[in-house]
Amino acid sequence: MTKRSTTDLTQWLAPFLARLGHKARRRMCPLYVEGLIGPGDRKSVEPMAARLAPGDYDQLHHFISSGVWDERSLEEELAIQADRLIGGAKTVLVIDDTALPKKGSHSVGVAPQYASALGKNANCQTLVSLTLARDELPIMIGLRLFLPENWIGDADRMAKAGVPEDCRAARTKPEIALAEIDRVLAADVRFGVVLADAGYGLSAPFRHGLDARGLTWAVGIPRHQKVYPCDVRLVFPIAGRGRPRKRHIPDQLSLSAEDMLETAKWRRLSWRKGTKGPLKAAFAAVRVRVADGRPQRIGDKGQQHMPGEEAWLVGERRNSGERKYYLANLPAEVDLKTLAATIKARWVCEQAHQQLKEELGLDHFEGRSWRGLHRHALMTMIAYAYLQSRRLAEASGGKKNRRRTAASKSAGDTPRRRRHSRPRAALQMPPLQTHAPKA
């Protein structure tokens, strides 16, 4: 990094450094972040120290692995800075997870499990991620390790890896995500919609948790997710022999999401411009009531979940012929294009995962402890937020220059926007600029 860029980084890190207290920690934090941003094939402690400060390896290792400082305070500052940069009603909060392939069995949380990035089972660690995003600019603000069952059942193994006592109980990925959302809400981060794939959307407790927090959401679901027509009614069944019924039952049977949209009207839409032109797919949407109420036996039909809250059921038919299904609690008056654009905004978190790994070494940490892994992940997120702040500043500077030519237009020439208007054009973002050499 140049002297000017190093100074710029140090200034940007000032609110983070203020929370670290001790001067040694305030010196190691910028050094670690600079190592992540700078050139080099490996972004673990030893090679970063060798490149930047050969005499500081022990201090840098101590800072990330065992130093006494509260990472929760820096996580809060990261959320505050991300909100300052892109928070608002047009911003989305994307829930996902990412896998870090590993060899051996001693690194915290490592186990054979499904790795979404690889599309198969692999020996890896899985981190639940929260990404704040607006237009084409994502900022990751949360990475929390998921502990598989074979770790939860081994207290000695967890103790050896330094897993905190309050993190040793079994928690599903959706439960971890809800806890992280609570942390983000406590930091007053502003966003309009929560997005998640079917790994989270199939969880009724996750959707109910979002509802309980008063959040707007759009989530993927499997094609067999059961729903009811929106006009379903609860009625008393006709009494037969035996005891009379004490509970209402739905007057219609639930259907799979796939079957519910079989006769729906599909429209081909473009939700945003890609590098090769408009991105298009066919979409259909109907209002339904989700079958996630209490289970009840209904005659010879067996157990069925009762109708729950009303929501949008959305189908996507891709050019390849593949179909995807979603549920969303957006208002009933929202149009199909807005639904499609909202759902498809989730893609940007995959870009963030890739950049944190390829550019900043998220998966390069060589330690085995809970604390070290989460601190390394936190430093990569802080480095990523810094780089995104530079991208945003560069893009906003260009936008201001373009606006000068339109300064003479009257206010009356500008159309008013409704609350749920079609998504505005994305700010044209320059590429992420690390100091790593390009392949």
Language-model regions, residue ranges each:
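Short, solvent-exposed helix-loop connector elements
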Residues: 205, 328, 335-343, 358-375, ...
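Active-site-proximal, Lys/Arg-enriched surface segment
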Residues: 65-149, 154, 159-160, 295-302
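Basic, low-complexity segments
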Residues: 1-20
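Short, conserved catalytic/metal-binding motifs centered on acidic residues
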Residues: 48-49, 89-103, 130, 193-202, ...
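Short, basic/hydrophobic alpha-helical segments
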Residues: 77-82, 163-192
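Short, surface-exposed basic-aromatic patches at helix termini and helix-loop junctions that form
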Residues: 186, 206-216
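Electropositive nucleic-acid engagement tracts
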Residues: 20-26, 31-105, 112, 218, ...
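An anionic, glycine-rich sequence signature occurring as long contiguous blocks
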Residues: 10, 119, 133-162, 166-169, ...
